[in-house]
Design a protein with these regions (language model features):
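Active-site beta-strand->loop->alpha-helix modules in alpha/beta enzyme cores, enriched
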Residues: 1-112
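The feature marks non-catalytic terminal segments
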Residues: 85, 113-162
Length: 162
């Protein structure tokens, strides 16, 4: 799973990670060197039980990622092993976020064959997973006001290119 901000993995893919933690490496591409967010991300990984993760910082905001540097680093990760699924933001950036859209476009260019995206599900996630996901989101104390805007009840992954 490759996302644009610490908390995106929990917000948009928390149920997936909580039920399939052994299948994922999580990479966060962050524009800031924010120690609080870094610690929250590490706490999120520990809460979920993810052993493989990377938090990259210093990437310019907006749609203007330093694309050459980012593509180089993404290719390094993608070549580590034979991945069968890459999960990231959807083409619309969930709520229109330019960094989410840009990351989707880059990954769709690099590995369209195995790309999956976050989508809103119509089926509510189970109460057992919902309780865990809510507890997971509490790890991101610095983002509480932002996270309150989103509904944690529905979550779905969708293959990008069928």
């Amino acid at each position: 799973m490759i996302v644009s901000h610490p908390d995106d993995e929990a917000l948009f893919g928390g149920a997936e990670l909580l039920t399939h933690s052994d299948e994922y490496k999580v990479v966060v591409i962050d524009e800031y060197h924010n120690e609080v967010r870094r610690k929250e991300f590490i706490s999120s990984m520990k809460f979920i039980g993810i052993e493989e993760y990377e938090h990259w910082t210093g990437y310019k905001g907006g749609e203007d990622y330093h694309r050459e540097k980012l593509i180089y680093e993404l290719l390094r990760v993608l070549r580590e092993r034979e991945y069968t699924k890459i999960v990231t933001h959807n083409r619309k950036g969930e709520y229109g976020h330019p960094r989410h859209r840009a990351l989707h476009d880059i990954l769709n260019h690099l590995r369209p064959d195995i790309l999956w995206q976050f989508d809103k599900g119509r089926k509510r996630i189970s109460n057992k997973i919902l309780i865990k996901k809510r507890d997971l989101l509490k790890v991101y104390e610095s983002q509480k006001e932002v996270l309150d805007w989103f509904s944690p009840w529905y979550e779905k992954l969708m293959k990008v290119n069928k």
